[in-house]
């Protein structure tokens, strides 16, 4: 809970699901007490006071006592004290503000965004106590969000959060896993949330969002008076109106740059062609830098500043491309989104739900809207990447915000296919010629593949394989990333990687027999051996296909082949076949993983499925020498 990220756009909001305290966990730390109070002294100012004590019992729990405080022109750290007490005996360390490490987050910019940090050291067990106050000024868009813990295997004995406002001052709030009460007294209204004996959570592969498991509180004033910009945030339309104010005058470009952009697009005949030219220009002339700059991290850098500096964050780069498009007559919409959470909370509009900005560019000539990721121009135009496809977003118009959902893709389009041609020698060594075909979201880890060093390429291509490659050479990389103009809304990115591998240990020869692995280039399914604590969650469907061709070495014949296998389960479908004809062995294995959520108590079923699939991947065929 101490590693509170106070960035207004940087927090996930938890889904409204029951919280489960995992009381049986062996924990690394215990939050003995944690209290936070936000005292609103005026519509534009307040004081946030935090007091917390954490017992660290295991070095793995040290991060639970790490301190991070963000400040900027709206928030100032006005007091701090701390104490580190070794439980086994030793010197008590007293902390003052000068002991915190200070990081400027806006070097060279007209802003004072910064981070104060401290990580306690010393042998465990260790008792850590912090008390500090942050003063808010010039406006409040939201109150500090409360998250009980941010690290696994951390218990909470007791915690509380209070928002103290003048009576009649309207706020809105959302919470999970905490008890709420309110009290009006002496002209003040106190909104309070309390928590006792939270058992912590454990991190596991394919688990639910941690924000389902952690108690939380989100609260905001209904009216905003922030940095001189006033508005309301009862719904997304009102929030859009307020954000539009922050963008006024930020799209202006110098006349010389406008003339340059118009010259660059002189021969373009469609809006898509203009977008392609300027997207390429954005890629070649700017870089992404994470900033919390301008009106508490909510206002984009001016387009002229991004042009001058050559960098920007998601807000600044999106605003810059929007300005460049406007200069050549192309309309676009500034779009706020959470790139790790697809659904917004119904009936609760708040800036905390968003952590990213994109650009929506309507393109009637291809019957589509291009959702442009300005922080990573390696994404092909027209592709709705996995952090956007199917997500609810808000378009920011002058007349207000418009909540819509970015179209997703059919699950059937998400595929990875590998073709492997094996040239097997009688001594068990082999030379492999491979082709990896990637479709839709499977291309994302490979967007920058051409620019990677050979050892990094090798690591990516062999990840999850049992086969140990002595040599690996990439012989070709192709893609269809420029096909959006021809395919429009039906565009699906594809990439093909051709490569070769050599290995001395493909098959195991034992006398007159060779034991040949059926599919040593497969990526095995993972499953944990111990008891499952969290539900198992697969968010989408994917298909993985392996096609292996193995000519039988001269002087050898097939003695046995694994029998075919077909599995149908709630977690996926799998098939495996192996056949020999005209001196060639053909192996085909296909797995389709299905989306869904499985209770932890039923994890044994998934484990059995994963082991059955891996057994098929690891099966062997037997070749025997002729005449023996």
Enumerate the predicted regions with their spans.
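A sensor for short, sequence-defined functional sites
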Residues: 22-628
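Bacterial Sec-dependent N-terminal signal peptides
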Residues: 1-24
């Amino acid at each position: 809970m101490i590693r509170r990220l106070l960035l207004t756009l940087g927090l996930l909001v938890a889904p409204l699901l029951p919280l489960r305290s995992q009381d049986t966990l062996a924990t690394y730390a215990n939050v003995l007490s944690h209290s936070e109070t936000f005292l609103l002294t005026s519509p534009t100012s307040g004081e946030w006071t935090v007091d917390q004590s954490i017992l660290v019992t295991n070095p793995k729990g040290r991060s639970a006592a790490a301190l991070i405080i963000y400040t900027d022109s709206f928030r100032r750290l006005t007091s701090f004290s701390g104490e580190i007490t070794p439980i086994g005996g030793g010197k008590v360390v007293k902390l003052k503000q000068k002991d915190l490490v200070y990081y400027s987050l806006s070097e060279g910019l007209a802003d004072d965004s910064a981070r104060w940090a401290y990580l306690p050291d010393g042998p465990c067990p260790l008792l850590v106590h912090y008390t500090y106050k942050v003063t808010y000024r010039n406006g409040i868009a939201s109150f500090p969000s409360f998250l009980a813990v941010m690290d696994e295997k951390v218990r909470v004995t007791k915690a509380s959060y209070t928002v103290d406002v003048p009576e009649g001052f309207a706020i809105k709030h959302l919470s999970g896993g905490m008890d709420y009460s309110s009290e009006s007294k002496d002209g003040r209204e106190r909104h309070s949330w309390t928590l006792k004996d939270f058992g912590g959570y454990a991190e596991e592969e394919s688990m639910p969002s941690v924000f389902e498991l952690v108690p939380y509180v989100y609260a905001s004033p209904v009216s905003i008076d922030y940095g001189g910009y006033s508005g309301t945030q009862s719904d997304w339309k009102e929030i859009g109106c307020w954000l539009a104010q922050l963008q006024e005058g930020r799209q202006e470009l110098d006349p010389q740059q406008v003339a340059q952009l118009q010259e660059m697009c002189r021969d373009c005949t469609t809006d898509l062609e203009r977008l392609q030219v300027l997207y390429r220009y954005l890629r070649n002339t700017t870089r992404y830098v994470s900033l919390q700059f301008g009106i508490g991290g909510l206002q984009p850098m001016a387009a002229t500043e991004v042009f001058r500096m050559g960098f920007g964050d998601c807000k600044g780069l999106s605003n810059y491309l929007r300005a460049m498009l406007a200069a050549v007559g192309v309309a676009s919409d500034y779009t706020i989104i959470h790139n790790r959470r697809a659904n917004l909370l119904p009936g609760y509009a708040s800036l905390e739900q968003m952590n990213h900005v994109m650009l929506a560019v309507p393109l009637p000539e291809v019957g589509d809207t291009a959702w442009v990721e300005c922080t990573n121009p390696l994404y092909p135009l027209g592709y709705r990447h996995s952090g956007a496809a199917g997500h609810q977003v808000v378009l920011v118009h002058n007349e207000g915000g418009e909540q819509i959902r970015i179209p997703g893709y059919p699950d059937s389009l998400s595929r990875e296919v590998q073709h492997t041609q094996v040239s097997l020698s009688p001594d068990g060594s082999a030379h492999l010629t491979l082709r990896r075909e990637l479709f839709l979201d499977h291309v994302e880890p490979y967007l920058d593949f051409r620019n990677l060093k050979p050892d990094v390429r090798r690591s990516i291509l062999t990840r999850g394989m049992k086969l140990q490659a002595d040599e690996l050479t990439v012989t070709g990389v192709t893609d269809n990333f420029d096909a959006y103009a021809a395919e429009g809304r039906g565009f699906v990115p594809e990439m093909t990687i051709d490569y070769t591998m050599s290995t001395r240990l493909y098959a195991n020869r034992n006398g007159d027999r060779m034991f040949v692995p059926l599919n040593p280039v497969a990526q095995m399914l993972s499953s944990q051996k111990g008891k499952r604590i969290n539900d198992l969650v697969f968010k989408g469907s994917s298909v993985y296909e392996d096609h292996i061709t193995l000519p039988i070495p001269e002087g050898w014949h097939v003695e046995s082949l694994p029998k075919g296998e077909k599995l149908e389960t709630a977690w996926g479908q799998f098939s495996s076949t192996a056949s020999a004809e005209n001196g060639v062995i053909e192996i085909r294995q296909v797995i389709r993983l299905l989306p869904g959520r499985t209770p932890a108590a039923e994890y044994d079923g998934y484990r059995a499925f994963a082991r059955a699939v891996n057994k098929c991947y690891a099966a062997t065929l037997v070749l025997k020498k002729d005449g023996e």
